[in-house]
């Protein structure tokens, strides 16, 4: 049995939301009434710190390298097809397609730092359901802790994953 651990981290600047048309994704869930949005001058167009941190951790644990490079075949910037609304939910599902044949996900531990004004507890079940669906795992596999960040203009996510190599027949 081969077990491997991966660590993923994402940090983005956020700003107060002024228009309702702006999307704020966390864990594949659109926080419709969010007080914040990602500051796109300092982040990718498809920003979702939870998904990107978990994807980075999975790529690291399975020794597949940097997810941005794998998704884009060597391009240095993220270039998704379609709009952020269509692509944000696909990050983990696309990651799963790279690892599913050789790896089983045993555990995902997520630590999210977000300003207290943004309530996450009401969305936890939806975040868990999304991650479980995208990665085809049980809710018992995931843990999510929410803390207040040191800088109220940032959102940080740290993800640690444990994967096990599947036996090949």
UniProtKB/Swiss-Prot annotation:
PANTHER family: 2-C-METHYL-D-ERYTHRITOL 2,4-CYCLODIPHOSPHATE SYNTHASE, CHLOROPLASTIC (PTHR43181:SF1). GO terms for biological process: terpenoid biosynthetic process. It comes from Mycoplasma genitalium (strain ATCC 33530 / DSM 19775 / NCTC 10195 / G37) (Mycoplasmoides genitalium). GO terms for molecular function: 2-C-methyl-D-erythritol 2,4-cyclodiphosphate synthase activity. This is Uncharacterized protein MG459. Gene3D superfamilies: 2-C-methyl-D-erythritol 2,4-cyclodiphosphate synthase. It comes from the Bacteria.
């Amino acid at each position: 049995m081969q077990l491997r651990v991966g660590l993923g981290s994402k940090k983005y600047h956020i700003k107060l939301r002024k228009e309702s048309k702006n999307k704020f994704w966390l864990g594949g869930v659109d926080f419709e009434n969010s007080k914040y949005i990602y500051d796109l001058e300092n982040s990718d167009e498809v920003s979702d710190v939870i998904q990107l941190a978990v994807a980075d951790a999975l790529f690291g644990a399975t020794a597949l390298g940097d997810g941005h490079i794998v998704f884009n075949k060597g391009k240095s910037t993220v270039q998704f097809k379609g709009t952020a609304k269509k692509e944000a939910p696909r990050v983990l599902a696309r990651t799963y397609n790279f690892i599913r044949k050789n790896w089983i996900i045993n555990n995902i531990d997520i630590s999210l730092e977000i300003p207290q004004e943004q309530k996450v507890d009401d969305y936890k079940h939806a975040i868990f359901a999304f991650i479980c669906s995208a990665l085809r795992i049980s809710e018992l596999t995931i843990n999510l802790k929410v803390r207040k960040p040191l800088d109220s203009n940032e959102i940080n996510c740290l993800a640690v994953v444990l994967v096990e190599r599947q036996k090949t027949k």
